[in-house]
Regions:
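Hydrophobic, helix-rich cores of sensory/ligand-binding and other regulatory modules
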Residues: 1-93
Length: 93
């Protein structure tokens, strides 16, 4: 069962982007972007999110990192945890 739906992720992105003036991405448990302030990124793979899922910790990406990792930009990627399980990743650039 997927706890983090595209509808929920889109609402989180919209509300967070309004308050932070930052680009926000939400990725599912496979590292696929399911919601983004930058709509053209939806449906693409985010390698930074995959690193978060593998390491089970926050990952900060530099310009150098984003040059070699598919679908990334410099910023921070944090796990979304629900009932002690990572259900997705939020990225802020």
């Amino acid at each position: 069962m997927n706890i983090l739906t595209e509808e929920m992720a889109t609402l989180i992105v919209e509300e967070t982007a309004k308050r932070t003036q930052s680009n926000i991405n939400i990725m599912n448990f496979n590292g696929e972007i399911i919601a983004s302030f930058d709509k053209k990124r939806v449906g693409t793979i985010h390698e930074g999110a995959r690193k978060v899922l593998e390491r089970e910790e926050t990952v900060i990406l530099s310009k150098e990192d984003s040059a070699i990792l598919e679908g990334t930009q410099p910023g921070v990627n944090l796990p979304i945890i629900f009932q002690d399980n990572i259900v997705g990743v939020i990225g802020i650039t």
